[in-house]
C-alpha cells in the first residue's frame, strides 16, 4: 500500500487521467473530489462490497429451476 500525505486543496494523480483532490478536512472526515473519465466506475468501498455480494448471491441459483424453463 502506498501512503501519501496531502493537505487541503492538494491532489494526487492515478495514471494520466484520474485526479483526486482533498477538498475538506473536518471532524475526522475527509471530503475528496475525483476527476476521472466518465467511463470510469467510482464506488465507495462499502457499496462495491455490497454489489459484489449481491452478484455472488445471484450466481447461486437452483439448476432445477432452469430445467423447468427449458421446456
From Swiss-Prot:
It is found in: Cytoplasm. Keywords: Bacterial flagellum biogenesis, Cytoplasm, Repressor, RNA-binding, Translation regulation. GO terms for molecular function: mRNA 5'-UTR binding. Its main location: cytoplasm. Belongs to the CsrA/RsmA family. GO terms for biological process: bacterial-type flagellum organization; mRNA catabolic process; negative regulation of translational initiation; regulation of bacterial-type flagellum assembly; regulation of carbohydrate metabolic process. Disulfide bonds: none annotated. A translational regulator that binds mRNA to regulate translation initiation and/or mRNA stability. Usually binds in the 5'-UTR at or near the Shine-Dalgarno sequence preventing ribosome-binding, thus repressing translation. Its main target seems to be the major flagellin gene, while its function is anatagonized by FliW. It comes from Clostridium botulinum (strain Alaska E43 / Type E3). GO terms for cellular component: cytosol. The lineage of its organism: Bacteria, Bacillati, Bacillota, Clostridia, Eubacteriales. Homodimer; the beta-strands of each monomer intercalate to form a hydrophobic core, while the alpha-helices form wings that extend away from the core. This is Translational regulator CsrA. InterPro entries: CsrA (IPR003751), CsrA_sf (IPR036107).
